[in-house]
Amino acid sequence: MLFLLSPAKKLDYDSPVHVETHTQPLFVDQAAALIKVLKTKSADEIAELMSLSPALAELNAGRYGAWKRSFTQANSRQAVLAFNGDVYEGLQADTLSARQLDWAQDHVVILSGLYGALRPLDLMQPYRLEMGTRLHTPKGKNLYEYWGSGIAEYLNERQAGAKAPVIVNLASEEYFKVVDLKTLKARVVQCVFQDWKNGAWKVISFHAKRARGLMARYAIAHKVARPEGLQGFDSEGYAYDAAASSADKLVFRRKQA
Protein backbone atom coordinates (compact mmCIF):
# COMPACT_ATOMS: atom_id res chain seq x y z
CA MET A 1 0.00 0.00 0.00
CA LEU A 2 1.35 3.42 -0.99
CA PHE A 3 0.36 6.80 0.44
CA LEU A 4 0.45 9.84 -1.87
CA LEU A 5 1.17 13.32 -0.52
CA SER A 6 1.33 16.75 -2.13
CA PRO A 7 4.49 18.81 -1.73
CA ALA A 8 4.51 22.25 -0.06
CA LYS A 9 5.36 25.74 -1.28
CA LYS A 10 7.02 26.52 2.05
CA LEU A 11 10.50 25.01 2.35
CA ASP A 12 12.96 24.60 5.23
CA TYR A 13 16.63 24.31 4.36
CA ASP A 14 17.84 25.85 7.65
CA SER A 15 16.76 23.60 10.53
CA PRO A 16 19.27 20.90 11.51
CA VAL A 17 18.54 17.52 9.89
CA HIS A 18 18.26 14.65 12.38
CA VAL A 19 19.04 11.79 9.96
CA GLU A 20 21.94 11.30 7.56
CA THR A 21 20.25 8.60 5.47
CA HIS A 22 19.35 9.83 2.01
CA THR A 23 18.63 8.56 -1.49
CA GLN A 24 18.86 10.05 -4.96
CA PRO A 25 15.69 11.24 -6.74
CA LEU A 26 14.50 8.98 -9.53
CA PHE A 27 13.36 11.45 -12.21
CA VAL A 28 16.50 13.60 -12.52
CA ASP A 29 16.48 13.59 -16.35
CA GLN A 30 12.89 14.81 -16.44
CA ALA A 31 13.58 17.46 -13.76
CA ALA A 32 16.68 18.66 -15.64
CA ALA A 33 14.62 19.09 -18.83
CA LEU A 34 12.10 21.23 -16.92
CA ILE A 35 14.88 23.30 -15.36
CA LYS A 36 16.26 23.91 -18.86
CA VAL A 37 12.89 25.40 -19.87
CA LEU A 38 12.60 27.43 -16.65
CA LYS A 39 16.11 28.86 -17.08
CA THR A 40 15.01 30.54 -20.32
CA LYS A 41 12.50 32.67 -18.41
CA SER A 42 13.17 36.04 -16.80
CA ALA A 43 12.05 36.79 -13.25
CA ASP A 44 9.19 38.87 -14.70
CA GLU A 45 8.05 35.94 -16.84
CA ILE A 46 8.23 33.59 -13.84
CA ALA A 47 6.20 36.07 -11.78
CA GLU A 48 3.49 36.12 -14.44
CA LEU A 49 3.53 32.35 -15.05
CA MET A 50 3.27 31.46 -11.36
CA SER A 51 1.48 34.55 -9.99
CA LEU A 52 4.43 35.36 -7.72
CA SER A 53 5.64 38.61 -6.17
CA PRO A 54 8.78 40.11 -7.77
CA ALA A 55 10.85 39.01 -4.75
CA LEU A 56 9.63 35.39 -4.94
CA ALA A 57 10.12 35.35 -8.70
CA GLU A 58 13.74 36.52 -8.27
CA LEU A 59 14.31 33.88 -5.58
CA ASN A 60 13.06 31.10 -7.82
CA ALA A 61 14.88 32.35 -10.92
CA GLY A 62 18.01 32.09 -8.77
CA ARG A 63 17.07 28.57 -7.69
CA TYR A 64 16.65 27.43 -11.29
CA GLY A 65 20.00 29.00 -12.17
CA ALA A 66 21.76 27.24 -9.28
CA TRP A 67 20.12 23.84 -9.87
CA LYS A 68 22.53 21.00 -10.65
CA ARG A 69 22.09 17.42 -11.80
CA SER A 70 24.18 16.19 -8.86
CA PHE A 71 22.35 16.11 -5.53
CA THR A 72 24.52 16.40 -2.42
CA GLN A 73 23.90 17.18 1.23
CA ALA A 74 25.44 20.59 0.50
CA ASN A 75 22.86 21.64 -2.12
CA SER A 76 19.90 19.45 -1.11
CA ARG A 77 18.06 17.87 1.77
CA GLN A 78 15.68 14.95 2.16
CA ALA A 79 12.31 15.88 0.64
CA VAL A 80 10.22 15.00 3.69
CA LEU A 81 12.41 17.29 5.82
CA ALA A 82 12.58 20.11 3.25
CA PHE A 83 8.82 20.59 2.76
CA ASN A 84 7.27 22.69 5.50
CA GLY A 85 3.61 23.54 4.74
CA ASP A 86 0.37 22.55 6.50
CA VAL A 87 0.60 18.87 5.50
CA TYR A 88 4.14 18.62 6.83
CA GLU A 89 3.29 20.38 10.09
CA GLY A 90 0.80 17.55 10.60
CA LEU A 91 3.35 14.91 9.59
CA GLN A 92 6.18 16.35 11.75
CA ALA A 93 8.82 14.27 9.98
CA ASP A 94 11.59 15.82 12.09
CA THR A 95 10.26 13.83 15.06
CA LEU A 96 10.03 10.49 13.22
CA SER A 97 12.69 7.94 14.14
CA ALA A 98 15.17 6.58 11.60
CA ARG A 99 13.22 3.32 11.60
CA GLN A 100 9.92 5.14 10.97
CA LEU A 101 11.50 7.10 8.13
CA ASP A 102 12.71 3.83 6.62
CA TRP A 103 9.11 2.55 6.67
CA ALA A 104 7.92 5.83 5.13
CA GLN A 105 10.55 5.48 2.40
CA ASP A 106 8.88 2.24 1.32
CA HIS A 107 5.27 3.41 1.62
CA VAL A 108 5.03 7.19 1.04
CA VAL A 109 5.34 8.99 -2.30
CA ILE A 110 5.43 12.79 -2.56
CA LEU A 111 4.15 14.09 -5.89
CA SER A 112 6.06 17.04 -7.35
CA GLY A 113 5.74 19.33 -10.35
CA LEU A 114 9.52 19.35 -10.86
CA TYR A 115 10.61 15.96 -9.54
CA GLY A 116 7.55 13.91 -10.54
CA ALA A 117 7.56 11.57 -7.56
CA LEU A 118 9.83 11.68 -4.54
CA ARG A 119 10.47 9.15 -1.81
CA PRO A 120 10.71 10.80 1.63
CA LEU A 121 14.50 10.43 1.87
CA ASP A 122 15.24 11.47 -1.71
CA LEU A 123 17.49 14.52 -1.81
CA MET A 124 15.80 17.60 -3.21
CA GLN A 125 17.14 20.97 -4.30
CA PRO A 126 14.84 23.91 -3.49
CA TYR A 127 12.32 24.89 -6.15
CA ARG A 128 8.87 26.28 -6.83
CA LEU A 129 6.83 24.61 -9.58
CA GLU A 130 3.27 23.74 -8.74
CA MET A 131 1.68 20.91 -10.68
CA GLY A 132 -1.04 23.20 -12.06
CA THR A 133 1.51 25.56 -13.68
CA ARG A 134 0.85 26.08 -17.39
CA LEU A 135 4.49 25.61 -18.35
CA HIS A 136 4.94 24.91 -22.06
CA THR A 137 7.49 22.18 -22.82
CA PRO A 138 8.27 20.08 -25.91
CA LYS A 139 5.82 17.53 -24.46
CA GLY A 140 2.82 19.83 -24.17
CA LYS A 141 1.22 22.93 -22.71
CA ASN A 142 1.25 21.99 -19.02
CA LEU A 143 2.86 19.67 -16.48
CA TYR A 144 0.12 17.05 -16.74
CA GLU A 145 1.01 16.61 -20.40
CA TYR A 146 4.71 16.69 -19.53
CA TRP A 147 4.47 13.85 -17.01
CA GLY A 148 1.87 11.93 -19.04
CA SER A 149 1.46 8.37 -17.78
CA GLY A 150 4.94 8.33 -16.22
CA ILE A 151 3.87 8.75 -12.59
CA ALA A 152 1.18 6.05 -12.84
CA GLU A 153 3.71 3.70 -14.47
CA TYR A 154 6.13 4.37 -11.61
CA LEU A 155 3.42 3.62 -9.02
CA ASN A 156 2.62 0.39 -10.89
CA GLU A 157 6.29 -0.60 -10.70
CA ARG A 158 6.42 0.15 -6.99
CA GLN A 159 3.56 -2.29 -6.37
CA ALA A 160 4.39 -4.83 -9.08
CA GLY A 161 4.63 -7.69 -6.57
CA ALA A 162 1.42 -6.89 -4.67
CA LYS A 163 -1.59 -9.19 -5.12
CA ALA A 164 -4.03 -6.35 -4.48
CA PRO A 165 -2.20 -3.01 -4.93
CA VAL A 166 -3.71 -0.02 -3.14
CA ILE A 167 -3.00 3.71 -3.38
CA VAL A 168 -4.21 5.86 -0.48
CA ASN A 169 -4.60 9.36 -1.86
CA LEU A 170 -3.66 12.04 0.66
CA ALA A 171 -2.71 14.50 -2.09
CA SER A 172 -4.71 17.48 -3.34
CA GLU A 173 -6.80 17.30 -6.49
CA GLU A 174 -4.22 19.44 -8.34
CA TYR A 175 -1.51 16.88 -7.66
CA PHE A 176 -3.47 13.64 -7.85
CA LYS A 177 -4.57 14.64 -11.36
CA VAL A 178 -1.01 13.84 -12.56
CA VAL A 179 -1.67 10.14 -11.85
CA ASP A 180 -3.14 8.74 -15.06
CA LEU A 181 -5.96 6.52 -13.78
CA LYS A 182 -6.24 4.66 -17.10
CA THR A 183 -2.65 3.48 -16.61
CA LEU A 184 -2.79 2.94 -12.84
CA LYS A 185 -3.49 -0.67 -11.85
CA ALA A 186 -4.04 -0.09 -8.13
CA ARG A 187 -7.29 0.44 -6.29
CA VAL A 188 -7.50 4.06 -5.08
CA VAL A 189 -8.75 4.89 -1.59
CA GLN A 190 -9.56 8.53 -0.80
CA CYS A 191 -9.44 10.03 2.68
CA VAL A 192 -11.82 12.93 3.36
CA PHE A 193 -11.48 15.16 6.43
CA GLN A 194 -14.46 17.28 7.44
CA ASP A 195 -15.13 19.78 10.21
CA TRP A 196 -18.52 20.85 11.54
CA LYS A 197 -19.11 24.49 10.61
CA ASN A 198 -22.29 26.57 10.41
CA GLY A 199 -24.51 23.52 10.83
CA ALA A 200 -22.89 21.35 8.15
CA TRP A 201 -19.91 19.07 7.53
CA LYS A 202 -17.36 20.88 5.39
CA VAL A 203 -13.86 20.29 4.07
CA ILE A 204 -11.89 23.28 5.37
CA SER A 205 -8.70 23.54 3.34
CA PHE A 206 -6.24 24.41 6.12
CA HIS A 207 -7.58 21.73 8.47
CA ALA A 208 -7.81 19.12 5.69
CA LYS A 209 -4.19 19.71 4.64
CA ARG A 210 -2.96 19.31 8.21
CA ALA A 211 -5.13 16.19 8.63
CA ARG A 212 -3.54 14.58 5.56
CA GLY A 213 -0.17 14.95 7.26
CA LEU A 214 -1.57 13.61 10.53
CA MET A 215 -2.96 10.60 8.68
CA ALA A 216 0.39 9.92 7.00
CA ARG A 217 2.03 10.06 10.42
CA TYR A 218 -0.60 7.68 11.83
CA ALA A 219 0.05 5.22 8.99
CA ILE A 220 3.81 5.41 9.56
CA ALA A 221 3.54 5.05 13.35
CA HIS A 222 1.19 2.05 13.08
CA LYS A 223 2.71 0.55 9.90
CA VAL A 224 -0.77 0.39 8.39
CA ALA A 225 -0.87 -2.27 5.68
CA ARG A 226 -4.58 -2.25 4.69
CA PRO A 227 -7.11 0.56 4.19
CA GLU A 228 -9.22 -0.79 7.08
CA GLY A 229 -6.28 -0.08 9.37
CA LEU A 230 -6.78 3.64 8.82
CA GLN A 231 -10.21 3.61 10.47
CA GLY A 232 -8.59 3.91 13.90
CA PHE A 233 -7.20 7.36 13.05
CA ASP A 234 -8.17 9.72 15.88
CA SER A 235 -5.57 12.51 15.84
CA GLU A 236 -6.64 15.98 16.99
CA GLY A 237 -10.27 15.00 17.51
CA TYR A 238 -11.02 13.31 14.18
CA ALA A 239 -13.01 10.07 14.14
CA TYR A 240 -13.94 7.65 11.37
CA ASP A 241 -17.57 8.00 10.25
CA ALA A 242 -18.66 4.61 8.91
CA ALA A 243 -22.08 5.85 7.76
CA ALA A 244 -20.56 8.59 5.60
CA SER A 245 -17.82 6.31 4.23
CA SER A 246 -17.56 3.64 1.54
CA ALA A 247 -14.89 1.03 0.83
CA ASP A 248 -12.88 3.46 -1.29
CA LYS A 249 -13.77 6.70 0.51
CA LEU A 250 -12.89 6.98 4.18
CA VAL A 251 -14.54 9.95 5.88
CA PHE A 252 -13.20 11.40 9.13
CA ARG A 253 -15.08 14.09 11.01
CA ARG A 254 -14.70 16.27 14.08
CA LYS A 255 -16.87 18.85 15.77
CA GLN A 256 -14.17 20.96 17.39
CA ALA A 257 -11.57 22.69 15.25
Swiss-Prot record:
InterPro entries according to UniProt: YaaA (IPR005583)
Gene Ontology CC annotation, any one: cytosol
GO BP field: response to hydroperoxide
Family: Belongs to the UPF0246 family.
Protein name: UPF0246 protein BP2452
